[in-house]
Regions:
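Conserved beta-strand-loop-beta-strand hairpin that lines the nucleotide-binding pocket
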Residues: 1-18, 62-142
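Conserved ATP-binding N-box helix of the HATPase_c
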Residues: 46-70
């Protein structure tokens, strides 16, 4: 848990949800809908919600394309009135399915305030490499 997680976890009004879907591009719409709803409930503007949706779409698509067959994508969303943090994870067939020099990563980096990618060693029980992308978007005070 990094400092932004602790700040959100300590908030009295934090909203948290976990969702698991099949690692299938057709399921990304469900993730977008959940994240959008959480962000709207937390009081983010329509533009901020759109940025969150785009970042989540890029992260989920990247991991789904690298996921092993018949696997699941996990998504954790935590939000309060100041920020939203989303972590998406999947078991991938490659050690590093994330192209940090690619356009999608550049987009995520541009529209979020904090972006990380974690790669774990091969997990024999899961049959692949656990990979996660996490990002935080801070609500802008207008």
């Amino acid at each position: 848990m990094d400092s932004s997680d602790r700040i959100i976890a300590d908030s009295i009004h934090a909203t948290s949800i976990q969702i698991q879907i099949d690692a299938d591009l057709g399921q990304v719409v469900m993730l977008r809908a959940v994240a959008e709803t959480v962000a709207l409930i937390a009081g983010f503007t329509v533009d901020e919600v759109a940025d969150t949706r785009v970042a989540l779409d890029e992260a989920a698509t990247c991991l789904i394309l690298g996921a092993i067959p018949d696997s699941q994508l996990h998504c954790d969303v935590v939000a309060d009135s100041f920020r939203i943090r989303i972590e998406v994870g999947a078991v991938c067939g490659d050690t590093d399915p994330i192209d940090t020099a690619g356009f999608g990563w550049h987009v995520m980096h541009s529209i979020t305030d904090h972006l990380t990618a974690d790669h774990d060693p091969y997990d024999r029980a899961q049959g692949g490499y656990p990979v996660a992308i996490a990002f935080t978007q801070v609500r802008r005070v207008h």
